[in-house]
C-alpha cells in the first residue's frame, strides 16, 4: 500500500476517531499523591472524570475508522491495520500509563477539588455528556448536528465559550499531536513492511507526512470544535461558564494539564506498538482479497 493512499484515504477516517477521543478530554505539579488511599482516589478520579470511559473507546473508535471501506484501500491492508490496532490499543496497558501519570502529577488537594466538581450535579451531567460524545456511535449524530449548525449557526457568545473550552481543556492541541503521531506511525509501519527496494527513505517519508498534516490538522480542528458544540448542546451558557470557572481554577488547571499529558503519553506508547505491529500484520494478511 503506497504512502499516498494511507494519507489520502485511510487517515481521514482514523482522524475522525482520534478527534472523537480528543475533544472528550479535559486537561503545576506539586507533591504527588501516594499510598493506597491516594491510589483509590486516582482510580475514582479516572472513573468520575470519564477518562477511563474514553480510554475504553479508543480501540473501538480506531477500528471503526480503519474498517470503513475506502476507495483504493485493499481489504488486506484494512485487516492488517485492524489487527495491529487491536494489539496496540488495548485499554489495560493504556490505563496503567494514564494512572501512573495522574498519580505523579496531582496532589491530594488537587484530586479532592477535582472530585468535588465532578461529583456535583452539573459536573456529573457534563461528564455523562462527554462520555456519550466520545463513543464511536456518536459520530453519526455529530455529523447530523453539523447540518443543524449550518442551518442555525451558534450565537457569538456560545462560539466564544466553546473556543474557551477548547483552549482550557487542550482538546485541539492534543488531537493535533495525536493525529501527527498516528499518521507517522502508520506510514512508518507500512513502509517497513515493503520490500527493501520499494521502501521510501526515512527523511523523504517524514517530509511527505509533514506535507499532509496541515490539511488533516485543519480537518481535525474543525471536528474538535464541532464535537465540543455537540457535547455541550444541552447546557446553558451559564453552565458552561461554571465549567470554565473550575477549569481555570488552580486545581482545574492542574487536572487539565495532567489529563492531557497522561493521555498523550498513553497514546504515544500505543502508537509505537501500532507501528511495530503493522509489518507482521501486513505479512499475515498477504493475499487476502475483497473490497
Task: Label the predicted regions.
Residues 33-68, 155-184:
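Immediate post-signal-peptide N-terminus of mature secreted/exported proteins
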Residues 135-233:
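Extended amphipathic alpha-helical interaction segments
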Residues 214-291:
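A cross-kingdom marker for long, charged
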Residues 84, 88-174, 180:
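Acidic/His-rich structured neighborhood in mature extracellular/periplasmic domains
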Residues 2-16:
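Bacterial N-terminal signal peptides that target proteins for export
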Residues 13-26:
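Bacterial N-terminal signal peptides
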Residues 56-92:
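N-terminal, post-signal-peptide region of Sec/Tat-exported proteins
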Residues 26-32:
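Sec/Tat signal peptide C-region and signal peptidase I cleavage site
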Amino acid at each position: 500500500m503506497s504512502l499516498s493512499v494511507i494519507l489520502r484515504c485511510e487517515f481521514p477516517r482514523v482522524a475522525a476517531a482520534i478527534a472523537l477521543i480528543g475533544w472528550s478530554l479535559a486537561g503545576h505539579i506539586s507533591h504527588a499523591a501516594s499510598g493506597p488511599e491516594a491510589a483509590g482516589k486516582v482510580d475514582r478520579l479516572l472513573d468520575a472524570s470519564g477518562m477511563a470511559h474514553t480510554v475504553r473507546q479508543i480501540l473501538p473508535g480506531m477500528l471503526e475508522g480503519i474498517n470503513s471501506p475506502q476507495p483504493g484501500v485493499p481489504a488486506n491492508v484494512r485487516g492488517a491495520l485492524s489487527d495491529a490496532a487491536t494489539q496496540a490499543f488495548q485499554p489495560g496497558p493504556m490505563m496503567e500509563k494514564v494512572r501512573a501519570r495522574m498519580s505523579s502529577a496531582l496532589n491530594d488537594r488537587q484530586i479532592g477539588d477535582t472530585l468535588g466538581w465532578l461529583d456535583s450535579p452539573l459536573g456529573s451531567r457534563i461528564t455523562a455528556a462527554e462520555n456519550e460524545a466520545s463513543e464511536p456511535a456518536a459520530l453519526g449524530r455529530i455529523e447530523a448536528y453539523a447540518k443543524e449548525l449550518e442551518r442555525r449557526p451558534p450565537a457569538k457568545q456560545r462560539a466564544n465559550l466553546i473556543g474557551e473550552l477548547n483552549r482550557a481543556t487542550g482538546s485541539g492541541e492534543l488531537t493535533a499531536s495525536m493525529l501527527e503521531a498516528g499518521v507517522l506511525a502508520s506510514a512508518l509501519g507500512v513502509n517497513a513492511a515493503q520490500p527493501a527496494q520499494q521502501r521510501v527513505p526515512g527523511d523523504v517519508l517524514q517530509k511527505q507526512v509533514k506535507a499532509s498534516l496541515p490539511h488533516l490538522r485543519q480537518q481535525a480542528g474543525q471536528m474538535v470544535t464541532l464535537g465540543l458544540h455537540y457535547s455541550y448542546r444541552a447546557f446553558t451558557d451559564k453552565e458552561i461558564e461554571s465549567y470554565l470557572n473550575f477549569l481555570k481554577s488552580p486545581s482545574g488547571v492542574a487536572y487539565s494539564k495532567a489529563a492531557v499529558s497522561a493521555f498523550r503519553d498513553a497514546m504515544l506508547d500505543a502508537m509505537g506498538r501500532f507501528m511495530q505491529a503493522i509489518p507482521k500484520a501486513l505479512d499475515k494478511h498477504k493475499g487476502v482479497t475483497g473490497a
